[in-house]
Amino acid sequence: MAEITASLVKELRERTGAGMMDCKKALTEANGDIELAIENMRKSGAIKAAKKAGNVAADGVIKTKIDGNVAFILEVNCQTDFVAKDAGFQAFADKVLDAAVAGKITDVEVLKAQFEEERVALVAKIGENINIRRVASLEGDVLGSYQHGARIGVLVAAKGADEELVKQLAMHVAASRPEFVKPEDVSADVVEKEYQVQLDIAMQSGKPKEIAEKMVEGRMKKFTGEVSLTGQPFVMEPSKSVGQLLKEHNADVTGFIRFEVGEGIEKVETDFAAEVAAMSKQS
């Protein structure tokens, strides 16, 4: 009989989201073979949580699709990366995306209502909470998309650009996370908030207010460049900015959307060592 170590139990928990005792039992029955344990747990329906609907769904997939001059991007969440790779979960996400594209739907509540029965059935089958989180669309003369695995998806709309350039720009957005297209697009409230932060920092250094304000002006120009697409160094050629690249191609970016799985969702972190200690006291 193979030794069932705590690290093996932890790995199975992370991959399946199942409880510690369920994982230990499955590993014991599979003689320490983690892949066989997962297969057996799937067959028995053991990969589940007691209250699925209340569990935090912070894993999942991003899906993108271009249809003519409109592109769509969708996020569907589950609880673990194990289920995110499940064929049934992937098929569900694809079906939701196809419906969004066919109906030009950008209201996530409409999609949720349309697929609620299928979602509930899939939750019962897979054993994890599933949530259609958000959907968005982008129109443009030239559209491009990029997916970094299944966790990051980007849409870019441009004028005067070819498909290869738009693809490269989408890859840049995935890597560099700009929030705006151009420095002048940075919203007034974002600028004001950052200005006050930088002014406080400058004043705390003991500089007179007039000098501090001049220092902050320079910092703000740098800040708006850092958070805007055209102001960032191009990831494939850092010696030039994205703005310079676009100028060379006589092209413009009219918009972009970047989704990353689980961004903004607070995941519940379990203290595995504490849980093991608690279970030991009970036995």
From Swiss-Prot:
Keyword Protein biosynthesis included in the entry's annotation: yes
Involved in Mg(2+) ion dislocation from EF-Tu: annotated segments: 80-83
GO molecular function: translation elongation factor activity
Pfam families recorded: EF_TS (PF00889)
Intracellular or extracellular location(s): Cytoplasm
InterPro entries noted in UniProt: EF-Ts_dimer_sf, Transl_elong_EFTs/EF1B, Transl_elong_EFTs/EF1B_dimer, Transl_elong_Ts_CS, UBA-like_sf
Gene Ontology CC annotations of this record: cytoplasm
PROSITE patterns in UniProt: EF_TS_1, EF_TS_2
Keywords: Cytoplasm, Elongation factor, Protein biosynthesis
Role, per record: Associates with the EF-Tu.GDP complex and induces the exchange of GDP to GTP. It remains bound to the aminoacyl-tRNA.EF-Tu.GTP complex up to the GTP hydrolysis stage on the ribosome.
NCBIfam families: tsf (TIGR00116)
Family: Belongs to the EF-Ts family.
Name of the protein: Elongation factor Ts
Organism: Salmonella gallinarum (strain 287/91 / NCTC 13346)
This protein's encoding gene: tsf
